[in-house]
Regions:
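C-terminal helical subdomain
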Residues: 102, 191, 210-246, 251-255, ...
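Short, flexible catalytic-loop segment of classical short-chain dehydrogenase/reductase
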Residues: 193-204
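Rossmann-fold scaffold of SDR-type NAD(P)-dependent oxidoreductases
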Residues: 15-16, 73-81, 114-122, 190-194
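Catalytic loop of short-chain dehydrogenase/reductase
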Residues: 82-86, 113-184, 196-197
């Protein structure tokens, strides 16, 4: 098998592996010979090296999952995520960001030289620049416990009320803040911002009234919705050895939607900035 992407016989970790973009990653990684360690609260049916049940908003569950992972890891794919609503705001930030950060940081000591981390943010998080003060205030709570406690305060609940966008803004700024220190460890970190993607996630959105009449406003000019495989392939490419000098990048995977906004061809409904 041609190993141009560098994954053959390498250990990789995928969260949210049971469905959507995580499942898309798993499928492609298996095809190209990676040893896939799949983490999800739901059952993973793909023939992975190991499937591990984890509740990513629970620190003890994360620690137990990490204990089942190998000593050396080449790549991490942070794909676990939930929408808000219907998921409560506190749970959304804990799953989408706090748990993601905890897992990632517990794995850093196991990552190989020239290892890589890729996380799934969202175009909804690309207003990070205009909300930087609040995001940095939250990120100053740099432990699982302090972040958990802050979200339960009156201030924390208010500042994270738009929980889905806030959690993705935190993910983006966290990447920027940690690129340099990870570079010194020869580890890359990048984040993608997908355009609307058909998945179990999008079905949940439709159930609360945010159907395609809303999400159509955020699709590229070809009107096309992505699928989990489209985003999975992008993540696999970004974490691969072909992208070995790419780090600290916020990468829209949206067939040009962000470019259209940057060029002034579309209304900037989400206050997007790169």
């Amino acid at each position: 098998m041609n190993n141009i992407l560098g994954y053959k016989n390498e250990n990789v970790v995928v969260t949210g592996a049971a469905s959507g973009m995580g499942a898309g990653c798993v499928e492609r990684l298996l095809e190209i010979g990676a040893n896939v360690y799949a983490l999800d609260i739901n059952e993973v049916t793909a023939p992975v090296t190991r499937s591990i049940t984890v509740n990513i908003m629970d620190r003890d569950s994360i620690a137990a999952a990490v204990a089942e992972l190998p000593d050396q890891i080449y790549s991490v794919f942070n794909c676990a995520g939930v929408p808000c609503p219907p998921v409560p705001a506190y749970n959304t930030v804990m799953i989408n960001f706090v748990g993601m950060r905890e897992l990632t940081e517990q794995l850093l000591s196991r990552m190989k030289r020239n290892g890589s981390i890729a996380s799934v943010a969202s175009t909804a998080g690309m207003a990070w620049r205009s909300n930087m003060e609040n995001v940095e205030k939250f990120l100053a709570n740099d432990s699982f416990e302090s972040a958990d406690a802050w979200l339960k305060t009156e201030e924390g609940a208010a500042l994270s009320a738009d929980a889905y966008a806030f959690s993705k803004q935190c993910m983006i700024v966290y990447m920027f803040n940690n690129t340099a220190q990870l570079a010194r460890k020869h580890i890359r970190i990048n984040t993608i911002c997908p355009s609307p993607t058909e998945s179990a996630f999008s079905q949940q959105m439709e159930e609360i009234g945010l159907g395609k009449d809303v999400t159509d406003m955020f699709t590229p000019s070809n009107g096309q919705y992505a699928n989990g495989g489209d985003m999975g392939d992008a993540l696999v490419a970004i974490n691969s050895s072909l992208f070995r000098f790419v780090s600290g990048c916020l990468i829209p995977v949206d067939w040009g939607y962000t470019a259209e906004i940057t060029a002034g061809q579309r209304d900037n409904l989400l206050n997007i900035s790169l």
